[in-house]
Amino acid sequence: MPQVRQRIDSERLVREGVLMAVLRAACLFLVLAAAACGPTEPLNVVAIQTGKSLNTDHSVGNHATSFRPKDTMYVSVLSNGRGAGTITVKWSFGGQVVHEATKKVSYNDQAATDFRFQAADDFPIGDYAIEVIVDGKSLETRRVKVE
């Protein structure tokens, strides 16, 4: 009888060891999966830039609010820290949206997300509104001119 009890105890220890190994593997998988999903905090926008060119880090290089008809308009949305979100930029002329662009982003540090708009022909002369929206919430509307 002691041999049977010892064998049963040994089998129980093996099963418990296997169970613990499976639990450890499952926990490790969950930790890695959570890390791979990226930031879950909202994007922390710290500045919006408009201009005529971009730097290599995607921030605006030549800040401007006045453009010529053949220029490309650049917008850079600067964020700080860990966060994720959807950024939409809408360009409007005469009360009508003439261009819209959206990007899903996820950052762990300072970042710049760039958008650009170049007219197929020349931009009509006049006033333009550039609206920046993050996760469906309008953050700011900038006014620029084409002269």
Where are these regions (language model features)?
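Short, exposed beta-strand-loop hairpins at the edges of beta-sheets
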Residues: 119-146
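C-terminal motif of bacterial Sec signal peptides marking the signal peptidase cleavage site
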Residues: 33-36
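Short edge beta-strand/loop segments characteristic of extracellular beta-sandwich folds
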Residues: 72-80
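Conserved aromatic beta-strand anchor motif in extracellular beta-sandwich/beta-rich domains
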Residues: 89-93, 132
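Bacterial N-terminal signal peptides that target proteins for export
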Residues: 5-27
